[in-house]
């Protein structure tokens, strides 16, 4: 899932 404030897919 994409985390906007981290800018990563985890």
From Swiss-Prot:
GO terms for cellular component: extracellular region. It is found in: Secreted, Cell wall. Keywords: Cell wall, Secreted. Its main location: secreted. This is 20 kDa cell wall protein. It comes from Solanum lycopersicum. The lineage of its organism: Eukaryota, Viridiplantae, Streptophyta, Embryophyta, Tracheophyta.
């Amino acid at each position: 899932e994409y985390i906007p404030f981290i800018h990563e897919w985890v």
